């Protein structure tokens, strides 16, 4: 077994004494650092590699801290002006994950880089901490690598803001199978198809 396999097995048992101690120490360290900061290397190299990270030029790791909990509706003094069913302010649940929020914030900070993926590293009662893998589309090592140079294409600018990363797709309800026929090809396209009168010649 290689070293990464051992790391992977360690991470699977998060309640073990070793990992609990490690997470507690790291959590204290992360609380002292800035909300978004660059990491010299991934703290979970096995997970980072599974998500596409390579330890070579052009790949960057950023850490982000996101406050836990729901999203309060931003209305002045709780005045929502509408039907009683839409008057909720406090106990609303955000439809996207905190991980996608972390990706978006890092992507906004590093606008010249492309967000590839992200993963959980720690959490406490107030915050969740994530590491985001970014790729430099201007770097020659990226542009010449056929496995990653798809991300150089301009259509992949700010993937994280458009729900195109792994965690972003999850909140869009996209999947395969009979349960996803309302969202297959995108929910707006499905709505349009269902609401467009189509009169075939032979029907």
Swiss-Prot record:
Q: Which SUPFAM superfamilies match?
A: Ribosomal proteins S24e, L23 and L15e (SSF54189)
GO BP terms: cytoplasmic translation
Q: Does the keyword Cytoplasm apply?
A: yes
Enumerate the residue ranges of region (Disordered): 160-186
Bias (Basic residues) ranges: 169-186
Primary location class: cytoplasm
Identify the domain of life.
Eukaryota
Q: Which UniProt keywords apply?
A: Cytoplasm, Ribonucleoprotein, Ribosomal protein
One protein family per Pfam? Ribosomal_L15e
Q: Mind telling me which InterPro entries this protein's record contains?
A: Rbsml_eL15_core_dom_sf, Ribosomal_eL15, Ribosomal_eL15_CS, Ribosomal_uL23/eL15/eS24_sf
Task: State any single GO MF term.
Answer: RNA binding
Compartments (UniProt record): Cytoplasm
Cellular component annotations (GO), alphabetically ordered: cytosolic large ribosomal subunit
Matching Gene3D superfamilies = Ribosomal protein l15e
Family matches, as NCBIfam families? PRK04243.1
Protein role: Component of the ribosome, a large ribonucleoprotein complex responsible for the synthesis of proteins in the cell. The small ribosomal subunit (SSU) binds messenger RNAs (mRNAs) and translates the encoded message by selecting cognate aminoacyl-transfer RNA (tRNA) molecules. The large subunit (LSU) contains the ribosomal catalytic site termed the peptidyl transferase center (PTC), which catalyzes the formation of peptide bonds, thereby polymerizing the amino acids delivered by tRNAs into a polypeptide chain.
Similarity-based family? Belongs to the eukaryotic ribosomal protein eL15 family.
Subunit organization: Component of the large ribosomal subunit (LSU). Mature N.crassa ribosomes consist of a small (40S) and a large (60S) subunit. The 40S small subunit contains 1 molecule of ribosomal RNA (18S rRNA) and at least 32 different proteins. The large 60S subunit contains 3 rRNA molecules (26S, 5.8S and 5S rRNA) and at least 42 different proteins.
PANTHER family attached here? LARGE RIBOSOMAL SUBUNIT PROTEIN EL15 (PTHR11847:SF4), RIBOSOMAL PROTEIN L15 (PTHR11847)
Q: What is this protein called?
A: Large ribosomal subunit protein eL15
